Every structure is written in structure tokens, then in C-alpha cells.
Regions:
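Hydrophobic alpha-helical connector segments
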Residues: 62, 66, 76-106, 157-163, ...
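Helix-turn-helix
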Residues: 16, 24-58, 62
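Residues in soluble alpha-helical coiled-coils and helical-bundle/repeat scaffolds
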Residues: 4, 54-58, 62, 80-84, ...
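Hydrophobic/aromatic-rich alpha-helical bundle segments in the mid-to-C-terminal region
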Residues: 124-128, 132, 146-194, 201
Length: 202
């Protein structure tokens, strides 16, 4: 097998195991799954799992990194076709809220990862980078809107934090208790609230 084929197989196996890990962690939670569970889900041997990942923590870190990368890729695709700041801001909201409809298991996995923040610096840093990227994206959209005379914001950093808090806080509350409010209605209300924060004369 040549080097290219080896790399392709390596990437294929890692993707296979990461996908299996995502499913297993969503079902069992961080503390209750084993490497054997992931191997069985992937249809591979436990020895092969250990070949590609040092340990359980290493596998989970790679899983979190891939989850975050996929999120950012989807967001970038949604934003790159838009030109108006208002449309970009609404698209950001739509992508964030749609993730719960599309991948509810993601948030169960994410909450488990949050519980590991004080025990694993790599997981902490991965989450820090993810939320920083969200704030940076919102800040860039706001600055573009201000430059075009569409948005009026006094403190860009504070406004970015508020917007991310509104979106993520709404999603988190619904994940914990899906009877607390009508998710579809709340999404619309939150988007209106966000627009009222940034748009001139709204």
C-alpha cells in the first residue's frame, strides 16, 4: 500500500471511529461509555481504536474538534453567499437554531464536554476557541453593518457577547426542558430582539 492510500485509510478509519464516538457519547454520556462500545458501534476491534487514538480522552478531544470544525464550515457556507449585514446576522441565527433541529444529539454531547472543562485543558481550549470564533463572526458582521450605516452599536464586543448569549442560552434552555416554550416561536422572537439591538431606528 502506497503512502497516499495509507493516509486515505487512516482518515477513513478516524472518521469512522469519530462518527461512532459521537453516537455512543450522545446515547450513554461521557462517564458511561467505553472504548469497546465505540469499537462495536464502528464494527472494528478495540485494538484498532487504540491504534488510532491514544485513549478515551484523546478520542473525545478529536471528536470535539471535528464537531466544531463541521459547525464552522456549515456557518461559513451559509454566510459566504450573502452580501448584506442584516442577512448575514439572520443567517448566523438561523444556522445556530437549525442545528438543534438537525443534530439535537450534538448538544447532549456538548454538555458532556462542558462537564470536562475543569479536568481537560484541551477540551477547555477547544470550547474557548469555538465561542471566540462565534463572537468574532458576529463582531465582523456588526462592524460591516456599521460601516454601511445599517447598524448602530456603541460597544461591538458587548453586543457580540449578548447576541451569542441570547442564541446559546435559548438553545440550552430548550435542550434541558423542551416544554418550557415553543421553540419555533422563540427563535423568531429572539431574532427580532437581536435585530432591535443593532438596527438603526428599530
Amino acid at each position: 500500500m502506497n503512502e497516499r492510500n495509507k493516509n486515505n485509510l487512516l482518515n477513513l478509519r478516524r472518521a469512522q471511529l469519530t462518527k461512532a464516538a459521537y453516537k455512543v457519547v450522545a446515547q450513554k454520556g461521557y462517564n458511561d461509555f467505553t472504548i469497546k462500545d465505540i469499537a462495536e458501534e464502528a464494527g472494528l476491534s478495540t485494538g484498532l481504536v487504540h491504534y488510532y487514538f491514544k485513549n478515551k480522552e484523546d478520542l473525545l478531544f478529536k471528536l470535539l474538534k471535528e464537531m466544531n470544525a463541521n459547525l464552522k464550515e456549515q456557518l461559513n457556507k451559509a454566510l459566504m453567499v450573502l452580501t448584506e449585514p442584516k442577512d448575514k446576522l439572520l443567517a448566523f441565527c438561523d444556522e445556530a437554531f437549525a442545528l438543534l433541529d438537525r443534530e439535537k444529539a450534538y448538544f447532549y454531547v456538548l454538555i458532556d464536554f462542558w462537564a470536562r472543562i475543569n479536568h481537560d485543558t484541551r477540551i477547555r481550549q477547544a470550547n474557548v476557541k469555538l465561542f471566540q470564533s462565534y463572537r468574532d463572526e458576529i463582531a465582523a458582521i456588526i462592524k460591516e453593518g456599521m460601516a454601511k450605516g445599517v447598524f448602530m452599536v456603541v460597544d461591538v464586543k458587548l453586543t457580540s457577547v449578548i447576541i451569542i448569549s441570547l442564541i446559546q442560552g435559548t438553545i440550552l434552555q430548550y435542550v434541558i426542558d423542551n416544554e418550557v416554550f415553543n421553540y419555533r416561536e422563540m427563535k423568531m422572537n429572539i431574532k427580532e430582539q437581536i435585530l432591535s439591538i443593532v438596527i438603526k431606528g428599530k
